[in-house]
Amino acid sequence: MSSSTPNTLPLLSTNKSLSSPFTNNHSTFLSKPSQPFLHGRRCQSFKVSCNVGEHDKNLDAVDRRNVLLGLGGFYGAANLAPLASAAPIPPPDLKSCGVAHIDDKGTEVSYSCCPPVPDDIDSVPYYKFPPMTKLRIRPPAHAADEEYVAKYQLATSRMRELDKDPFDPLGFKQQANIHCAYCNGAYKIGGKELQVHFSWLFFPFHRWYLYFYERILGSLINDPTFALPYWNWDHPKGMRIPPMFDREGSSLYDEKRNQNHRNGTIIDLGHFGKDVRTPQLQIMTNNLTLMYRQMVTNAPCPSQFFGAPLGSDPEPGMGTIENIPHTPVHIWTGDSPRQGHGEDMGNFYSAGLDPLFYCHHANVDRMWNEWKLIGGKRRDLSNKDWLNSEFFFYDENRNPYRVKVRDCLDSKKMGFDYPPMPTPWRNFKPIRRSSSGKVNTASIAPVSKVFPLAKLDRAISFSLTRPASSRTTQEKNEQQEILTFNKMAYDDTKYVRFDVFLNVDKTVNAEELDKAEFAGSYTSLPHVHGNNDNHVKDVTFTLAITELLEDIGLEDEDTIAVTLVPKVGGEGVSIESVEIKLEDC
């Protein structure tokens, strides 16, 4: 991820006129104003309006799988211990905003990421939603027509033009700097770095961030109904960079992207620095499996989906979607082959300089809504410390505001929503099995003989005793079985990913994730902590496995086999112990 040279964006000529040569191709996708979808029933199939190429044959092949489309078949219910107390996070002190850092060597971002400080900084009011006449409906980017694309390009061009004044809070670079300041150590609270990743602040911060960014774009083209598109990477037909972002010379294009991942290349939602030599159909299948695991299996309750409370530790633990696919999409898009620090998308400080960042996070935000629709105990957190945490933003009129988490829980109340769309991962529970029966756990070393583990430099297997077996349905609803990795340490300036499997040994084919035995993955994106020289991260990693044990047929077993397969950076990962716990939701 880049050297100390910042991304330089071209300054466009000033044009205050709101007239523009929109392309009118009579598309049914979008009519003025920008209202691509209204309300409707969730559909079972979806036709895209963008042109398709040869690679779409594989997309259709995935569509033909009889488990791809349709809803239903979910397992809700229990999980995780109640959230620990952590004081509400106040908005950052802009007057003490400092230097942001890029890497563990102390490399400073060569420009200030701090926002302009308003004259009345000590009396910034709370934001109140303006009157709304109709919802802004965020469309899937891959299906957008040329009229919509022209509007989006124009709005982004005008935002870039505002960079003439480097202190204009509505300028493209100033908007990108919001992410840099909140994520690369520029803000401190109580002497600790303020970080909006790796905790329960992740979803609400980015929702508010996109809310104001979207409204600024709309104001620049006098269209209050303009809505950001979302990168539909959870659907096979959206698993590539949306075409509107891959046009050189467009205001939506960013030179600092991985050039090997352009022109319709299928994204790997588990990507961590290395391209897999796997057929496209298998990559898409793996993607849908990852989505099912992250949204359904591993996130039956709020604490696993949102992440851990932010307290004295600036990075207490991320939720399932932040882990995967959020982070791998950043890495896959960023230009790590040519840039020293993965710019733009591959580093927090520069991610907002790529317009695709906002499209990516629109789909991350959409996952918040989709997750709550699955049911069970999937609902917003009720912890007051979370609800009362605050952030600072400028609105489209350059007015400064404070905002609270509690006011962003319902996207419709904020004035935006997503159209009814198929979510094929909902019915993509892995059903194929690697083995026909139970692995002989007596032939595998017990956990006490394997841990503490000094380094995960190769695949390892071990047997683990469960706290209870043959649990009733009521017991499962009350408590989730949690596979827990205690005191896991690694250098958090390095890429890390390893996969976890149950009921298989270390000979498992880890390139095929669409197996019932695949439990989940752990990932980490390189990042820094301001001036902190200690980059060894000590975390607890958990996976909810109640559903998994049912699917594999191990509910009545007292002992199970667990296999860890390192993908990237395993040689730097140590784990003190592993256990299975029963925890309340």
Curated annotation (Swiss-Prot):
Keywords: Chloroplast, Copper, Disulfide bond, Metal-binding, Oxidoreductase, Plastid, Thioether bond, Thylakoid, Transit peptide. It is found in: Plastid, Chloroplast thylakoid lumen. GO terms for biological process: pigment biosynthetic process. Residues 1-86 form a transit peptide. Cu cation A binds at H179, H197, H206. Disulfide bonds join C97-C114, C113-C180. Cu cation B binds at H326, H330, H361. Its EC number is 1.10.3.1. There is a cross-link at C183-H197 (2'-(S-cysteinyl)-histidine (Cys-His)). Its cofactor is Cu(2+). InterPro entries: Di-copper_centre_dom_sf (IPR008922), Polyphenol_oxidase (IPR016213), Polyphenol_oxidase_C (IPR022740), Polyphenol_oxidase_cen (IPR022739), Tyrosinase/Hemocyanin (IPR050316), Tyrosinase_Cu-bd (IPR002227). It is an enzyme of class 1 (oxidoreductase). The keyword Signal does not apply. The keyword Iron does not apply. One of its GO terms (molecular function) is metal ion binding. Catalyzes the oxidation of mono- and o-diphenols to o-diquinones. This is Polyphenol oxidase F, chloroplastic. It comes from Solanum lycopersicum (Tomato).
